[in-house]
Amino acid sequence: EKLIESISKIAKTKQKCGLFLSGGLDSTMVLSIVKDLGLDLTVYICGYDDTKGLYWNHDAFRTESKLAVKTCKMWKVPYKVITLQQELMYHYDREWLNHTRYPWSDRNRRCPRYMLAKFAAKDGCKVIFTGDSADEIVTGYLHHGKFWEEGYKKNKIKRYQEYKWYPKIRHGNDAWNDLLLGDLLITSEQNVLATDQTCGMFGMESRPCFLGQNFVKWCYQHDGFFKFKQHPEWNTGTYKYLLREVMADYIPEHIRNKKKKVGWSSPWDNNHDRTVKLARML
């Protein structure tokens, strides 16, 4: 109820709007609510051409677009698949960096956002909905698997407390929530800023639909470990119990039953050791 109320409130607009949809739980959850709000809505899905990477291909991203299309067809939602061509990656990336001056993450992650925003703006969209920051609130990141390691939570929180930006007053003594709060203040801020700047360069407003203030506060006021309920068939930390089970009626089976955490990037050499090393050098 809290999440539905939050998404509905954030999505309220009379402007033409778009939604960036993957095959994941987060953006699908947002679509499940906004599709029934009477909005002038088009869904934008990132596809990829068939060229190969220099070192390897992360083909799960190509599967994501097919799952997203299946969702839109099931719900009879207008959608467009925009195919990202590898030969345009450098051009899109230069455009993104020249306009934002913000070297966020890497080219594989910047380009899909840039391309979808570019095409949504051409269609006249003024507002873009995303599922950004769900992982920081209801769990789901791959690194959340480390939370079960002995001493990890204690050491991580101790490190956070050395920084001035980390709140001294939080909602009780809940290490699970404290670590999620760290993600919210670090990872979420970067991702939200990246999407906001990308949409902004095309005269659009981005709205991360999981970040309603009342909903976020409510989540951090409740038992953190409850959000981390796991399933043996999923990688530890990625099950996302609240969306996959509690909100199961709002998410199609082909999305809920997907066992591999993918995220949103591009298939060409994604997270390969050599490309990661180069990005860190830059």
Question: What is the predicted role of each segment?
Answer:
Residues 1-250, 265-274:
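ATP-dependent adenylate-handling active sites, centered on carboxylate activation for C-N bond formation
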Residues 256, 261-281:
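Hydrophobic, amphipathic alpha-helical faces that serve as interaction scaffolds
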